From Swiss-Prot:
Reaction(s) this enzyme catalyzes, per UniProt: 4-(phosphooxy)-L-threonine + NAD(+) = 3-amino-2-oxopropyl phosphate + CO2 + NADH
Gene3D superfamilies: Isopropylmalate Dehydrogenase
Species of the source: Methylococcus capsulatus (strain ATCC 33009 / NCIMB 11132 / Bath)
Subunit record text: Homodimer.
Family per similarity comment: Belongs to the PdxA family.
Protein name (record): 4-hydroxythreonine-4-phosphate dehydrogenase
Function description: Catalyzes the NAD(P)-dependent oxidation of 4-(phosphooxy)-L-threonine (HTP) into 2-amino-3-oxo-4-(phosphooxy)butyric acid which spontaneously decarboxylates to form 3-amino-2-oxopropyl phosphate (AHAP).
C-alpha cells in the first residue's frame, strides 16, 4: 500500500491553504489527505483560479495515490469570514485543532506521516493560548523527545538547542541534553532513513571549537566527554569541529548528518544551499512529522506568487521516512 500522508492546512490567512490547493495539481505516489476547512480550500482555489474537486473523507479512509485536480479533505471548521492576509485570533483554536487531530490520527495508525503547513505563532499567543511551535505542541500530544532537523540539497542539520536566546545557549549545552539529542539523531537516522551506522559531524560551541580551551571550555567539559562515551557505544561521531570549516564540501561528503549547537550556527548554511526546498523534520517522536521551512507569507496569500518546492520536498521526505527507502523528487 502506498504511504498515507496527512497534511494540515496551517494558518487560514496565510499561504497554507494556497499550498494545499496548488499541491493538488501534482501527482504523487502516495495518498494525501488534507486536514482543514473545505469551504476555505474551495474559496482559495477559486481565488487562485485552480480547478479542483474536493472529496470529503473520514479519518483513516484509504485514498488513492494523489491525482491532479483532486483533493481529499478531512473536514475541520474554522471561524467564518477569513480573508487572505488578515489574521484573526478567533482562528487560533481551529489551527491548533488541525494539528492536534493530525497528531492523534497518526498516533492511532490511521496515517503514516504528518506534514504541516506554516502557522502564525503570534496570533495564537494573542488568543491567550501559550504556543511555542509545532514541535513542542505535537510532542505534548504524542510524547517522545523531539529533536529538530532540517534537510536540503543532500545534507541534514540537527540542532542541540532550538529557539533560545544566544545568551542562554551555553548553559543549555549539558551532558544530559547532548547525550539525549545525539541518541535520538543516531536512532532515527537508522530507523527512519535506513542508515546502518550513520556518520555524524558535531560542531563545537565556541569559535575554533574552543581553541584548546582558550576561547571557551564547553568543548572540553561537555562535548568531548559525551562524544567519547557514545563512540564506545558504537556511534560514528566526529568532532567537536569548528563550524566555520565543518561545512566545507570535503567534510560534508563524509557525513550523513551534522549536529549544530544552536539555531544560527547551522541553519544559515543549509538555507543558503537550498532554501526553497528545505524541510523541517521532527525526530524523536512516535510518529513521522515533516514541515515546510518557511512562514505564513501573509502578503502572498491568495496571490499565487508562491513557491511550493518546500512542501513538495516535505511530502517526498515523509514518503521516504514512511517507506524506509528514497523517494524521487516530484
Amino acid at each position: 500500500m502506498p504511504p498515507r500522508l496527512l497534511l494540515t492546512s496551517g494558518e487560514p490567512a496565510g499561504i497554507g491553504p494556497d499550498l494545499c490547493v496548488l499541491l493538488s495539481r501534482r501527482p504523487f505516489p502516495c495518498g494525501i489527505t488534507v486536514l482543514g476547512d473545505p469551504d476555505l480550500l474551495e474559496s482559495r482555489a477559486r481565488l487562485l483560479g485552480v480547478p479542483i474537486e474536493l472529496r470529503r473523507v473520514v479519518s483513516g479512509d484509504v485514498v488513492p495515490p494523489h491525482e491532479p485536480g483532486v483533493l481529499h479533505v478531512l473536514p475541520t471548521r474554522r471561524q467564518p469570514g477569513t480573508a487572505p492576509g488578515k489574521l484573526d485570533p478567533a482562528n487560533a483554536a481551529y489551527v491548533l485543532e488541525t494539528i492536534a487531530d493530525g497528531a492523534r490520527a497518526c498516533l492511532a495508525g490511521h496515517y503514516d506521516a504528518l506534514v504541516t503547513a506554516p502557522v502564525q505563532k503570534s496570533v495564537i499567543n494573542e488568543a491567550g493560548i501559550a504556543f511555542t511551535g509545532h514541535t513542542e505542541f505535537i510532542a505534548g500530544i504524542t510524547g517522545g523527545s523531539p529533536v529538530m532537523m532540517l534537510a536540503a540539497e543532500g545534507f541534514r542539520v540537527a540542532l542541540a538547542t532550538t529557539h533560545l536566546p544566544l545568551a542562554e545557549v551555553s548553559r543549555a549545552i549539558t551532558v544530559e541534553r547532548l547525550t539525549g539529542v545525539l541518541g535520538v539523531l543516531h536512532e532515527d537516522l537508522v530507523r527512519r532513513f535506513g542508515f546502518s551506522r550513520p556518520r555524524i559531524l558535531v560542531c563545537g560551541l565556541n569559535p575554533h571549537a574552543g581553541e584548546g580551551g582558550h576561547l571557551g571550555g564547553e568543548e572540553i567539559t561537555v562535548i568531548e566527554p559525551v562524544l567519547a562515551r557514545l563512540r564506545q557505544d558504537g556511534m560514528d561521531l566526529t568532532g567537536p569541529l569548528p563550524a566555520d570549516t565543518l561545512f566545507l564540501p570535503h567534510n560534508l561528503d563524509r557525513a550523513d548528518a551534522v549536529l549544530a549547537m544552536y539555531h544560527d550556527q547551522g541553519l544559515p548554511v543549509l538555507k543558503y544551499a537550498g532554501f526553497s526546498r528545505a524541510v523541517n523534520i521532527t525526530l524523536g517522536l512516535p510518529i513521522i512529522r515533516t514541515s515546510v521551512d518557511h512562514g505564513t507569507a501573509l502578503d502572498r496569500a491568495g496571490t499565487g506568487q508562491i513557491d511550493t518546492g518546500s512542501l513538495e520536498e516535505a511530502v517526498r521526505v515523509a514518503m521516504e521516512m514512511a517507506t524506509g527507502r528514497p523517494a524521487e523528487s516530484p
